[in-house]
Amino acid sequence: MDVIRPIEPAASNRHRFILVAIDYFTKWVEAASYKSVTKKVVADFVRNNLICRFGVLEPIITDNGANLNNHLMKEICEQFKIINRKSTAYRPQMNGAVEAANKNIKKILRKMIDKHRGWHKMFPYALLGYRTTVRTSTGVTPYLLVYGTEAVIPVEVEIPSLRIIQEAELSNAEWVSKRIDQVALIVEKRMVAVCHGQLYRQRMTRAFHKRVRARNFEVGQLVLKRIFPHQDEYKGKFVPNWQGPYMVCKVLSGGALVLSQMDGIVWPKPINSDAVKRYYV
C-alpha cells in the first residue's frame, strides 16, 4: 500500500492524493483519491475497500510514512490479526509492486485526460483499464485471476467482439453452464499464472545479478549514509550528500542494514546497503 502524492494541479474537487493498494499475486488494484491522506482516511480505506470486499488480509506492506503507520492502523491490524510489515527506508524497490502500479496508473491517467483538473472523473476508468490489461508478471489480466473470466470492456459494447456475439446467442441455461465451467477452471488459471510469475522473477533476478555487484557489510564496520533530496538534511546539489560515520550493528537478509550512531544509539529503521558506503579512517 502506498500514496501517489501530491498531484498538481489538484482536481476540481480539490483531491490531490491517491491511496493505492495492490494484491501481490493477482495484481488487482484498489485505489481512491482524497484531499489529504490522514490517519483516519488510511484506516477507513483498509477496512472499507480491502477487508469488507476481499476478506481479512494476511500481511499489509507499507512504507514508513506516518500516515500509513499510526495507532488506528495498529488497532485494525490487531482486531483482524493482520501483520503490518514495513519496507526498508529510502528504498521504493522493497515495495516494488505498488510502486509499479502507481507509475502505470499515472501513465494511464495522463493519456486519458484533456483537462488536468478533471483527472478525478477519469480515475475509475483508469482503474478499469489497469485491471483489464494483461500484466507481464502473470501473463493474464488481474480481472481474470479474481473473477475467473474477462470483463466486458466499454469498447466491446460499441463494437461487439466475437466473445460478445457468441454469448448473445446462448440461452440462459447455456450461459449459466458456461459460467460454471469458467469458475471451475479458475484454480487452474491461477496455477498457470503462478508458474508464469516464477519464471518471470527468475528472468528478472538473472538480469539484475548480471548488472549489479553485491555489496557485503559486516557488523562493526563504519559507513556513511546517503542524504536523499526529500530529507531535511539535504542542502542542495553542491553540498556533500553523505553523512556519518555510523556503525553497522546488524546485517539483515536481502541487503538491509541496521545502523547505530557513534554514541551507541541504534536507528529504529533498517536501511538498504546501496544507500551506504564504507567509511575509512
PLM regions and their residue ranges:
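Integrase module of LTR retroelements
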Residues: 1-189, 193-281
